[in-house]
Swiss-Prot record:
Its EC number is 2.2.1.9. GO terms for biological process: menaquinone biosynthetic process. This is 2-succinyl-5-enolpyruvyl-6-hydroxy-3-cyclohexene-1-carboxylate synthase. It comes from Shigella dysenteriae serotype 1 (strain Sd197). It comes from the Bacteria. Homodimer. It is an enzyme of class 2 (transferase). Binds 1 thiamine pyrophosphate per subunit. The keyword Ligase does not apply.
Length: 556
């Protein structure tokens, strides 16, 4: 009997089972112990293969692919610390709802905890973060193939969001020619191999039903809080709120067009919060709110009812309001709860939003970080998409810009780490095939610098703007101790990115003004390659501009 041949047949069943649940993208890191999985993936024509030498970046690449495709994405890694490097992407997926299937190769049990190289305790290493964890046995013909395929089917058939960890131990030898070992074991699945359906089909999830008293609540004074949504959901939500006559407070990821722009500014005005206190119901569509003032208002508001609608399960309200947690696809929920045409009940807030935007426009000429955040809507590629980094840049765009309704915007706003942002952006571009504008800070770019290797392979123009404010200037907005701020919080690195771009043979530009930036962008959108644009700005200007605008708008 050939161990290597049966390893491959066992792996082939696993990989084929994944295809029955919509897995098309598969991300593979180099490794020996994962050879059965890698070869099975390579031989299965249903997969689009992606490779990367860094497992942490590979996990985030898969995350980006899943964000756009809305389908589960598989990742194959070898044993040892390679597995641990998938943790950040798994955590993010669990919070933002992407589906990741982590196939981690392992040593067989007799080689664990006895000094064998590259052997660690992998089962359960991700604790409670995966939605499902499966520790498979060593491949053996004593276990029927129908057990293996139904085990995979159960985990994926009940997966609505987050990750599945499938730990796969393989004994040596890992290499060798294929023979008939295990062929009859594999063939006992019969015509399943010619079918395209799961062996075991799970019943669909039951979503929240129509709220029978909606006809009553839609006639009341309401507020719509729009969190992270798809482009389709964002457009529908904006029209729904407009019809109801309810003010919509839109997050940067809401894709609603933010009809009341600069919410993070005008929510700091007492007139706005006073008017919002009249709301009898708040309906929050989507989660992951970015703006600090929006988070503060959400925590302090006291409507009679607070409803949260999202297809992600779990508690999504840090303020623990009395109300309803409705698990549903947002677009479907809006169809079930039609708006009734009413006149807008808020008078002060639209005026404040307009004045706040005018205050931002008055400062748009300086070549700076805050001004880029405001101007970003002018630089978006046609029929494209935007990927926004974390820390200061996403807060500035949220507060100072007004993105078009229905324009796709992506970010990692679950755990909101700065790790893996370039890798995630690469996945977003690959899955969509669209022109992509990605904006990150200098520390974020440094953190994921080797992901520039992924950006060498793009199917449409990709522009990466690195806003270099020389450190983590988000801490300038926080009451960090002034004497320790630079050394222990900002951590300026005093570096530039020209040589990093050259190392990976990417185009690089460092514009000095808006005209130069716009010229570079116009050229970049013409060719399906990656262009790195480093925008060097004064260290604290972005944070200071935001603070000045907050003070100005609070006194309107």
């Amino acid at each position: 009997m050939s161990v290597s041949a049966f390893n491959r047949r066992w792996a082939a069943v696993i990989l084929e089972a994944l295809t029955r649940h919509g897995v098309r993208h598969i991300c593979i890191a180099p490794g020996s112990r994962s050879t059965p999985l890698t070869l099975a993936a390579a031989e299965n024509s249903a997969f689009i293969h992606h490779t990367h030498f860094d497992e942490r970046g590979l996990g985030h690449l898969a995350l980006g692919l899943a964000k756009v495709s809305k389908q589960p994405v598989a990742v194959i890694v070898t044993s040892g610390t390679a597995v641990a490097n998938l943790y950040p992407a798994l955590i993010e997926a669990g919070l933002t709802g992407e589906k990741l299937i982590l196939l981690t190769a392992d040593r067989p049990p007799e080689l664990i905890d006895c000094g064998v190289n590259q052997a660690i305790r992998q089962p359960g290493m991700f604790a409670s973060h995966p939605t499902h964890s499966i520790s498979l046995p060593r491949p053996t013909q004593d276990i029927p193939a129908r057990w293996l395929v139904s085990t995979i089917d159960h985990a994926l058939g009940t997966l609505h969001a987050g990750g599945v960890h499938i730990n796969c131990p393989f004994a040596e030898p890992l290499y060798g020619e294929m023979d008939d070992t295990g062929l009859s074991w594999q063939q006992r699945l019969g015509d399943w191999w010619q079918d395209d359906k799961p062996w075991l089909r799970e019943a669909p999830r039951l979503e929240s039903e129509k709220q029978r008293d909606w006809f009553f609540w839609r006639q009341k004074r309401g507020v719509v809080v729009a969190g992270r949504m798809s482009a389709e959901e964002g457009k529908k939500a904006a029209l729904w709120a407009q019809t109801l006559g309810w003010p919509l407070i839109g997050d940067v990821l809401s894709q609603t067009g933010q009809p009341l722009p600069c919410a993070d500014l005008w929510l700091g005005n007492a007139k706005a919060t006073s008017e919002l206190q009249q709301a009898q119901i708040v309906v929050q569509l989507g989660s992951s709110l970015t703006g600090k003032r929006l988070q503060q208002w959400q925590a302090s508001c006291e409507p009679v009812e607070y409803w949260i609608v999202d297809d992600i399960e779990g508690r999504l309200d840090p303020a623990h309001h009395r109300g309803r947690r409705l698990i549903a696809n947002i677009a479907d929920w809006l169809e079930l709860h039609p708006a009734e045409k009413c006149q807008p009940w808020c008078v002060e807030i639209p005026r404040l939003a307009e004045q706040a935007m005018q205050a931002v426009i008055a400062r748009r000429d300086a070549f700076g970080e805050a001004q880029l955040a405001h101007r970003v809507c002018d630089y978006l590629p046609e029929q494209g998409q935007l990927f926004v980094g974390n820390s200061l840049v996403v807060r500035l765009i949220d507060a100072l810009s007004q993105l078009p309704a229905g324009y796709p915007v992506y970010s990692n706003r679950g755990a909101s780490g700065i790790d893996g942002l370039l890798s995630t952006a690469a996945g977003v571009q690959r899955a969509s095939g669209k022109p992509t504008l990605a904006i990150v800070g200098d520390l974020s770019a440094l953190y994921d610098l080797n992901a520039l290797a992924l950006l060498r392979q793009v199917s449409a123009p990709l522009v990466l703007i690195v806003v270099n404010n020389n450190g983590g200037q988000i801490f300038s907005l926080l009451p960090t101790p002034k004497s320790e701020r630079e050394c222990f919080y900002l951590m300026p690195q005093n570096v530039h990115f020209e040589h990093a771009a050259a190392m990976f043979e990417l185009k690089y530009h460092r514009p000095q003004n808006w005209q130069e930036l716009e010229t570079v962008l116009a050229d970049a959108w013409r060719t399906p390659t990656t262009t790195v644009i480093e925008m060097v700005v004064n260290d604290t200007d972005g944070a200071q501009t935001l603070q000045q605008l907050l003070a100005q708008v609070s006194h309107l």
